[in-house]
Each structure stands twice: as structure tokens, then as C-alpha cells.
A protein has these predicted regions:
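Carbohydrate transferase catalytic cores enriched for Leloir-type hexosyltransferases
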Residues: 1-369
């Protein structure tokens, strides 16, 4: 039996990001697999103090609970002794403070080191140093897309032999609204006779929210945009644009919402618009498809890998192309029907159980070295 330590710090985030969702779902799925490995869940105390909700996954059988234990980073003499664990898996693109016998890191995106100004200079400097060290030290590097793998090959010293691509999973909704219920829910949100364009993700420069707003300005008045997500880098300019252009009556800024409310918003939407300029995976694309919503996404970065033939793609730098495609999806009932059907089929190809099984194979591969 081997002991595998995982940096589970992001599982206790009160407003889970993509990394937090990945961390939670991977750990929960690992708990459901048959394996002799023991998993050590590790937390940075500064994060743990925020919330104590997710400390240990709920195992499917009592016998599995013994395979999970917890260490806080406040106990360096008991946690950081490298021989305590046979393998360390960083789920958050950063290395542990001390070296382990074997290390794996999952990398989602590397935009801070590609020259794009999608974050502050201070963040880019700190992130770049941590990422480069993590990749250099790792025995294997897991990415969620071929796009990120190719970026790592281009911008770091990682070799192709170290890379393993494991796409993320998606949960099918626990409750699905009937078409009439979806329409009523949409009318409650944006008014009778109006169409609801949903945008899910942090409101920031990288998510291309400004061009989504510019596209909205060229669409009929009855088209409304609902933004779901907290504020990020560049959000001030986005909020100022909404005020300056007088879009307050057509744009709802809902901030972060819990999972149950998010599913309801997906199922109320006419379309998901996801024109992100840089994306390592793009989980909202699959989430929308799983909830029976057609998707219009940027035809760049990893998004075509995720959406496949089930989504329609646009030039994210061209607001008119975005607007034309959104209107086509909303106005063409037969196209919508086909996209929803293809989207549901596409979403079923991705599961967290498959993510856990593929990750476990990487663990076994590294442990055998």
C-alpha cells in the first residue's frame, strides 16, 4: 500500500473556482474507486480557516474511510517529512514547500507566462515562479486539454513524455426542468418575451466580457445578458462600460451563485455565451450542455476540444460575429434542438469517475518508477 498526499486546499473555498471544483470532484471520485492506496488530504491553514465544510470526501463504504486522513500545513514536522508519503499530487499548479520522493502537478492554464495581460504583474511574477518550479520538479504533469499541454511544451522545459492529458468531468443535473418550466423560469428572470444569454465565469478581461457586452448592443432589445461570477482582474472596466453605455436594464450581474441556483440559471437560459480569450478547459461549456442549453463559444484555446461538434464557435475578437451566432441559435428552433441533443450526448462523454480512474493510472505509473 502506498500513501498519496493531495493538496486539497482549494476544496474549502467558500466560492469554488474551477480548480476547487476539480479538487473536490477528483477526491470524491477517488473515494469511490477500489484501490489499496491511502490518501492524505493536506490543507494550508490560511485557507482552512475560511471554511471547514469539505475536509474528507463521503466514501461509498465504511471500509474506504480508513483510506483518507487529514494533515494541516501547520504541522510541518509531521506532514513535511518526505518519507511520510510516496507521492504528492499538487491540484493547484504549485509545488509543495519540501520535495517528496515523487511529485505530480495538474496544470490548467499558463496565461501568466505567455505574455498576456490577463492578471496583475505581481500575480504573473509569483504564479510564473511557482508554476515553472512545479513543472520542473514533477515526475508527471497532468493537463485537462491538449491545448495546455502544447503551451507547456512551448513555454517551459517540460518534455512530452512527462505530460498526461486527462479532460475534466461534469455532473448531470439532479433535476431537469420541463420546457414549459424553463420558459416560465426565464420570464421570471428577464421578463416575458425576452431571451436570456447566460455568461458563467469570473468577470474579468480574460473571459472577454467586454466583447459579450458589445455583441449585446447590436442585438434586439429583448435579448438580455445575465453574468454569473465574482469580480476578477479588469472587472472595474467592465462594470464601468455597463454604466456608460446605459446597459443596466439589459444586463444582470448576479455575482457568485451556489450550485443549485447555477443549475436553475443554466436551465432558464436561451443560450450559454462563453467567448473566453484564454481557457485551459472551460467547464461551463460542459455544464451548459449537461443542462440542455446550446453553447456559443470562442473558437480558440481549448474550447473546441471541450465542445466538439456540439457547440458553435465564434471569433472572440469580433462582437458582430458573436452577435450573429447568438441570434442564429436563439431564432432557429431546429438548430437549437439539434445543438441541445448533441450537447447532452457530448456531456455524457465526460465523467469525474473517468477522471479519477485516469488519474489513478498516473499514480500507479509514477509509483512503479
Amino acid at each position: 500500500m502506498s500513501t498519496i498526499a493531495l493538496d486539497a486546499t482549494y476544496t474549502v473555498e467558500p466560492q469554488p473556482s474551477g480548480i476547487a471544483v476539480y479538487s473536490r470532484k477528483l477526491i470524491e471520485a477517488l473515494a469511490g474507486l477500489e484501490t489499496s492506496h491511502h490518501f492524505l488530504l493536506c490543507y494550508r491553514l490560511s485557507r482552512l480557516a475560511r471554511r471547514r465544510e469539505f475536509l474528507r470526501p463521503a466514501p461509498k463504504a465504511d471500509a474506504q474511510e480508513s483510506r483518507f486522513s487529514i494533515r494541516l500545513f501547520q504541522e510541518p514536522l509531521t506532514f513535511w517529512l518526505p518519507w511520510q508519503s510516496d507521492l504528492f499530487h499538487s491540484l493547484a499548479q504549485r509545488p509543495p514547500a519540501f520535495r517528496f520522493k515523487r511529485e505530480i502537478v495538474t496544470v490548467f492554464d499558463i496565461f501568466p507566462i505567455t505574455g498576456h495581460e490577463y492578471s496583475s504583474p505581481d500575480f504573473r511574477r509569483k504564479f510564473s515562479a511557482l508554476l515553472l518550479e512545479a513543472v520542473e520538479r514533477a515526475t508527471r504533469v497532468i493537463t485537462a486539454s491538449r491545448y495546455t499541454a502544447e503551451q507547456l511544451l512551448a513555454y517551459t522545459s517540460v518534455s512530452d513524455s512527462k505530460l498526461r492529458i486527462i479532460p475534466l468531468g461534469v455532473d448531470l443535473p439532479s433535476l431537469t426542468l420541463a420546457p414549459v418550466e424553463r420558459l416560465l423560469a426565464r420570464e421570471r428572470l428577464v421578463g416575458e418575451g425576452n431571451e436570456m444569454i447566460l455568461s458563467v465565469g469570473v468577470i474579468q478581461t480574460r473571459k472577454n466580457t467586454l466583447n459579450a457586452l458589445r455583441a449585446l448592443e447590436t442585438l434586439p432589445e429583448r435579448y438580455r445578458l445575465v453574468l454569473v461570477g465574482g469580480d476578477g482582474y479588469g472587472s472595474e472596466a467592465i462594470h464601468e462600460y455597463i454604466r456608460r453605455q446605459g446597459l443596466g436594464s439589459r444586463v444582470q450581474v448576479r455575482g457568485y451563485v451556489a450550485l443549485g441556483e447555477l443549475q436553475a440559471l443554466y436551465q432558464s437560459a436561451s443560450v450559454l455565451l462563453f467567448p473566453s480569450l484564454e481557457e485551459g478547459f472551460g467547464l461551463p461549456v460542459l455544464e451548459a450542455m449537461a443542462n440542455g442549453v446550446p453553447v456559443v463559444a470562442a473558437g480558440t484555446a481549448s474550447l473546441p476540444e471541450v465542445g466538439g461538434e456540439a457547440a458553435l464557435y465564434v471569433d472572440p475578437h469580433d462582437p458582430r460575429d458573436i452577435a450573429r451566432t447568438v441570434q442564429l441559435v436563439i431564432e432557429d428552433a431546429e438548430l437549437r434542438r439539434k445543438m441541445i441533443e448533441r450537447g447532452l450526448k457530448r456531456a455524457r462523454e465526460f465523467s469525474w469517475e473517468r477522471v479519477a480512474e485516469a488519474t489513478l493510472k498516473v499514480y500507479d505509473e509514477v509509483l512503479s518508477l
